[in-house]
């Protein structure tokens, strides 16, 4: 059985073949409505919303390494509004971590704090790597990992509930799980 996302991306017309090469990797414009990093049959779809960013780079790291082995700038053609999206082919999700660098205006009064030298964690990351010991202050940048969706939705239809009808409860996991009870 395929998960909902696996079925969506396998039926998606963009999940086909590369159109260009960036930093030695075959690429094509991505699937803009899949936030974060989503594994596809032949590659990985990377999508990030920058809210005012003027350029974006995808950084690929070997696991547990601080320096990227590849930097892939998103072409302007791979941007719609504030969303950058690119499919990168030939990646084994078990062998790398990723992060972004985003450039744009620096204007704290307007809440714009872009710095093209800062490495940013994907806000949609499904797994975060970097801190090896829990509770110890980490002085390095966190990286994201790509995770396969292993949940089997079967024939269950997607929820038709309106966002205004949902109740979302956020839980601070560490405090909730810290006590042995």
Language-model regions: role of each:
Residues 42-46:
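Structural beta-strand segments of beta-rich domains
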Residues 49-55:
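Short proline/glycine-enriched turn/loop motifs at strand-loop junctions of beta-rich domains
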Residues 48, 171:
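Residue-level signature of catalytic and energy-coupling elements of molecular machines
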Residues 30, 60-61:
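Structured catalytic/translocation cores of nucleotide/phosphate-coupled proteins
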């Amino acid at each position: 059985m395929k998960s909902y996302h696996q079925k969506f991306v396998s039926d998606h017309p963009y999940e086909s073949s590369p159109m260009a090469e960036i930093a030695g990797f075959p690429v094509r414009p991505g699937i803009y409505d899949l936030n974060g990093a989503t594994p596809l049959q032949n590659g990985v779809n990377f999508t990030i919303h920058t809210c005012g960013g003027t350029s974006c780079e995808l950084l690929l790291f070997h696991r547990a390494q601080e320096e990227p082995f590849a930097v892939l700038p998103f072409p302007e053609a791979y941007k719609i509004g504030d969303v950058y999206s690119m499919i990168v082919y030939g990646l084994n999700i078990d062998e790398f971590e990723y992060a972004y660098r985003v450039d744009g205006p620096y204007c704290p009064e307007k809440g714009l704090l872009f710095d093209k030298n800062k490495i940013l964690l994907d806000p949609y990351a499904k797994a975060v790597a970097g801190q090896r010991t829990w509770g110890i202050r980490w002085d390095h940048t966190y990286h994201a990992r790509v995770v396969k969706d292993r949940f089997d939705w079967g024939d269950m239809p997607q929820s038709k509930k309106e966002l205004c009808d949902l109740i979302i409860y956020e839980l601070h996991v560490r405090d909730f799980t810290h006590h042995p009870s």
